[in-house]
Amino acid sequence: MLQLILHHPYASLAAGILLYFFCLATYRLYLSPVAGFPGPRLAALTRFYEYYYDGVKGGQFVWKVKDLHQKYGRLSCSTVVGQELKLEQGPIVRIGPCELHVNDPTFVSTLYPATGQRRNKDPFWTDQFGPKTAFGTVDHDHHRLRRGPFNRFFSKANVTRLEPMLRQQANKLCEKLEKYAGTGRVIDLSDPFGCMATDIISTYALGYSFNFLDAEDFQPNLLQGLNGFTPLAPTVKQFPWLLKLLRALPDSWALKINPKIAPFLDFQRTMKKVITDVEAEVQSEAGRPKADQATTIFHEVLRGDIPPEEKETARLWQEGEAIIGAGTFLQTPQEAV
């Protein structure tokens, strides 16, 4: 057998691959820093355990984690009730090769301390959002640099100043909804609220509104385009290089793969153009009084004292995509209105 491996390159390659996976499995099961925590062995061996429940069974991993706590959570002795010990479920289970799940709200302040601790992100979680965005930045200090220009725009005081615009958009939404009164038509409220959220955050971030509220029947809208990508999310999380491939594909090819993403592709094209327009505005405002200068998130980023590579167009349009996408797609803005 040894002679066969030494004299046949394919046999050597196969043996090397088998040895690699054997060593990897041994490390993950017995030598990893998290090897001592309870959990299914398959989850300890591969991240495809998570992918099976999220990608194949459709977003079920969060419920599987709950089951894992019930099955593998360590039991600990608590107080004596009469003659019996009260047993409590332990809060920590292993859900991946290098990942633990802690079912304890008090641990949040330890994991995300307010000050004094550096916390780098796991690329497995961030790569799916694109490495050029603040949200997708792994290094703690680099993330802080990218996040810095946005901080004041999301302070309580600055958000309070948005009230006139919020009222205007809310009145616009109500006027459109009143047109449907008595018609018997059914409106999925996620569409108008999604349109309103997109128009608000795009105006605040860019000084440009996508005017989705003006669309007939609130369609097409960005929320529909983002929903078209949702089924791909677990796969992109496992294989982040797919995100680069999807971005590189011609729009016509991408639409053949998934026609539902058409609104998102339109949004992406517009985002690139708007960022270019904002760059031109900032370059042309030299010498103008500060009171006459536009004050939006991306105008301030381009004026800010940050390295030139952080102001590149390719990075900024991805940042804009992330901010507006989050403001539209996340349930919080829609549920708030």
Curated annotation (Swiss-Prot):
| Protein topology in the membrane | Single-pass membrane protein
Question: In which pathway does this enzyme or protein participate?
Answer: Secondary metabolite biosynthesis; terpenoid biosynthesis
Query: Which coenzymes or cofactors are required?
Result: heme
The EC number of this protein is: 1.-.-.-
Give compartment(s). Answer: Membrane
Residues the record marks as carrying a glycan: 158
Q: Is Zinc one of the keywords UniProt gives this record?
A: no
A molecular function annotated in GO for this UniProt entry is: oxidoreductase activity, acting on paired donors, with incorporation or reduction of molecular oxygen
Question: Which regions span the lipid bilayer?
Answer: 4-24
Q: How does biotechnology exploit this protein, per its UniProt record?
A: Diterpenoid pyrones display various biological activities and FDDP C shows anti-cancer and anti-HIV activities. FDDP C also shows inhibitory activity of 42-mer-amyloid beta aggregation that is involved in the pathogenesis of Alzheimer's disease.
One GO process term, biological-process aspect: terpenoid biosynthetic process
**GO cellular component terms listed in the entry, alphabetical order:** membrane
Q: Which InterPro entries match?
A: Cyt_P450, Cyt_P450_sf, Cytochrome_P450_monoxygenase
Which keywords describe this protein according to UniProt?
Glycoprotein, Heme, Iron, Membrane, Metal-binding, Monooxygenase, Oxidoreductase, Transmembrane, Transmembrane helix
**Organism superkingdom:** Eukaryota
According to its UniProt entry, what is the function of this protein?
A: Cytochrome P450 monooxygenase; part of the gene cluster that mediates the biosynthesis of diterpenoid pyrones. The first step of the pathway is the synthesis of the alpha-pyrone moiety by the polyketide synthase dpmpA via condensation of one acetyl-CoA starter unit with 3 malonyl-CoA units and 2 methylations. The alpha-pyrone is then combined with geranylgeranyl pyrophosphate (GGPP) formed by the GGPP synthase dpmpD through the action of the prenyltransferase dpmpC to yield a linear alpha-pyrone diterpenoid.
Q: Which family does it belong to?
A: Belongs to the cytochrome P450 family.
Name it: Cytochrome P450 monooxygenase dpmpJ
Provide the species name.
Answer: Macrophomina phaseolina (strain MS6) (Charcoal rot fungus)
UniProt lineage: Eukaryota, Fungi, Dikarya, Ascomycota, Pezizomycotina
